[in-house]
Amino acid sequence: MSNYFNTLSLREKLGQLGKCRFMKREEFNDGCNFIKDWNIVIVGCGAQGLNQGLNMRDSGLNISYTLRDAAISEKRQSWQWATENGFTVGSYAELIPQADLVLNLTPDKQHTSAVTAVMPLMKQGATLAYSHGFNIVEEGMQIRSDITVVMVAPKCPGTEVREEYKRGFGVPTLIAVHPENDPQGNGLAIAKAYASATGGDRAGVLESSFIAEVKSDLMGEQTILCGMLQTAAVLGHKQLIAQGMDAAYARKLLQYGLETTTEGLKHGGITNMMDRLSNPAKILAFDMAEELKVILRPLFQKHMDDIIEGRFSATMMADWANDDVNLLTWRAETAETSFEKSPECDTEISEQEYYDKGIFVVAMIKAGVELAFDAMVDSGIINASAYYESLHETPLIANCIARNMLHEMNVVISDTAEYGNYLFTHAAVPLLADYTASLTLEQLGEGLKESSNNVDNARLIEVNEAIRSHGVEVIGKELRGYMTDMKKIASAK
């Protein structure tokens, strides 16, 4: 197999990268009826597999799970989750031949082996679905010509897919049809129905392409979503304790500070997050973010270039073939950081304190979101896709750190995301070491001591305008408006 993206002409590449359309609510009036009577078999029962399946069953669909023989005979975690939730579980040979729709929700690393195993068993004219297109785009998996291939990619971890559905809402979702595999011309109808069954249509659906999803997803998770959050936690903690702050308090300030400040990001973008700071702190955080962007821009651009040209995938797959030596080494190194090893702290910190003392955290988040967004858009990815893969998902990942530190984040994200995160962090931490060492305790985690809120009016206006006019803020305001409207519709029902 060879990288599918690299087989396309420049015109085809740009066309696929730039494919992105926010779908109208009326396009989902038929809900999931198109696949209502289908036999739907999910391959794998991890976080996405289980939670998507629960949502789809609650939407009235016929769902069962197929697992490897060893997973069934040894009653592994995937078997336990499926059976404990009352689903039919069977082997590939038992369930795949009767399936109208097969959802491949195994870990990225297992996609080739899973699809290779199930494809010969799939009946003529069946549909194969993914929630991430890495196997198609980067590994170049060739699917039988009679099989329709679609993608439905919720823009959050699997647990959140379920929780939002239970609240009567859903999570923004990207759908796509593989242009090489739509023999009956009904791929889009299938993808729409699948997305509706998971609750995605309640939050907003983007019609995109496999290529745009993969390239933007890889960039987001490597840089702002995981890499910058981990870098902020590791470097921030190291410098705070070096300047005399209690290790446990520093851990709490960062662990929950990342969650609190990105919660502000979720509701009103970078503008709202920055507005939670005092005027002097806002200007300081803005200036720090600009300095960080100068240092980090070449690294972000390198990651984007490596993703677009396939070098990242080749490097990661070489590590797969080498028994994950690099990934496991970086995972072990992360566990040994002072942030991860520090004890818990029971000192109360108010919501506003996290902002007041989080100037460094806010600057890192602002710089990371804007750099990731810009790198994607500069590569031909449409701004809506870039928004979802940068700003939108950041609070969801920060929630994982709040639950159980960096370990939780790296367990919940995909194997592909974990590798990319370590790759970025491994470069970013030494790159920022001198810069963070030059910061004062006020900048890092104590907050400004001056009581005056006085600033130069012209400078404040200039900073506010720069924050609000960035591309991620412009498209973000529009997309959050769509989601708010849709949430009202869902609540009314």
From Swiss-Prot:
Keyword Amino-acid biosynthesis in record: yes
GO MF: ketol-acid reductoisomerase activity; magnesium ion binding
Residues involved in Mg(2+) 1 binding: 217, 221
Residues reported in the UniProt entry to bind substrate: 414
EC assignment: 1.1.1.86
Catalytic residues (positions): 132
Pathway assignment: Amino-acid biosynthesis; L-isoleucine biosynthesis; L-isoleucine from 2-oxobutanoate: step 2/4; Amino-acid biosynthesis; L-valine biosynthesis; L-valine from pyruvate: step 2/4
A GO CC term attached to the entry: cytosol
GO terms of biological process kind: isoleucine biosynthetic process; L-valine biosynthetic process
Record-annotated KARI N-terminal Rossmann domain positions: 17-208
Ligand binding (Mg(2+) 2): 217, 389, 393
UniProtKB keywords: Amino-acid biosynthesis, Branched-chain amino acid biosynthesis, Magnesium, Metal-binding, NADP, Oxidoreductase, Repeat
NCBIfam families cross-referenced by the UniProt entry: ilvC (TIGR00465), PRK05225.1 (NF003557)
Protein's name according to its UniProt entry: Ketol-acid reductoisomerase (NADP(+))
Gene: ilvC
